[in-house]
Amino acid sequence: MEFNLVTIGFTIVNFIILMLILKHFFFDKVNKVIDDRNNEVALTIKKADAQNEEARLLKVESEKNLEDSKLQGKTIVENYKVKAEKVSEEITAEAKTEAQNILERAKRETQREKEKAEDEIKNQVVELAVLISSKALENSINEAEHRKLIEDFVSKVGI
């Protein structure tokens, strides 16, 4: 194995020339492509991080809005529940009042009917007593005296 310095020198020169040519035509362009790609990846990562942060903030805001909505819904339901109970109590009170009024009217009507029936019975008793006594006495007392006697009798009896 012999080392030829001239061959080694030409090989080194060829290698340097090749490197310069490659650097001039390829390495700068390849490095530029790699740098551009690195920048693009870094930018994409920044955008993704920004979007993740935005999504996190939106999620927090949405959760807060959801909690607020739940609280509002609960408040609305409670308000309507209170209103419904109040309306129910008012309706119940009105119904009780109406029922009481109906009962009072029925009692008054019953009392009137009772008094009317008592008056009617009293009149019939008086007429019947007059008829019976007139037949029994056969004209011994006049009718006015007879009626007075019967009315006294009826008032004492309590009819």
UniProtKB/Swiss-Prot annotation:
GO cellular component, one term: plasma membrane
Annotated signal peptide: none
Subcellular location: Cell membrane
Bilayer-crossing regions: 2-22
Transmembrane among keywords: yes
Keyword Transit peptide: no
Alphabetized GO MF terms: proton-transporting ATP synthase activity, rotational mechanism; proton-transporting ATPase activity, rotational mechanism
Membrane topology (UniProt): Single-pass membrane protein
Keywords: ATP synthesis, Cell membrane, CF(0), Hydrogen ion transport, Ion transport, Membrane, Transmembrane, Transmembrane helix, Transport
PANTHER family named in the record: ATP SYNTHASE SUBUNIT B, ATP SYNTHASE SUBUNIT B', CHLOROPLASTIC
HAMAP family linked to this entry: ATP_synth_b_bprime (MF_01398)
Similarity-based family: Belongs to the ATPase B chain family.
Complexes and interactors: F-type ATPases have 2 components, F(1) - the catalytic core - and F(0) - the membrane proton channel. F(1) has five subunits: alpha(3), beta(3), gamma(1), delta(1), epsilon(1). F(0) has three main subunits: a(1), b(2) and c(10-14). The alpha and beta chains form an alternating ring which encloses part of the gamma chain. F(1) is attached to F(0) by a central stalk formed by the gamma and epsilon chains, while a peripheral stalk is formed by the delta and b chains.
Protein task: F(1)F(0) ATP synthase produces ATP from ADP in the presence of a proton or sodium gradient. F-type ATPases consist of two structural domains, F(1) containing the extramembraneous catalytic core and F(0) containing the membrane proton channel, linked together by a central stalk and a peripheral stalk. During catalysis, ATP synthesis in the catalytic domain of F(1) is coupled via a rotary mechanism of the central stalk subunits to proton translocation. Component of the F(0) channel, it forms part of the peripheral stalk, linking F(1) to F(0).
Protein name: ATP synthase subunit b
Organism name: Clostridium acetobutylicum (strain ATCC 824 / DSM 792 / JCM 1419 / IAM 19013 / LMG 5710 / NBRC 13948 / NRRL B-527 / VKM B-1787 / 2291 / W)
Gene: atpF
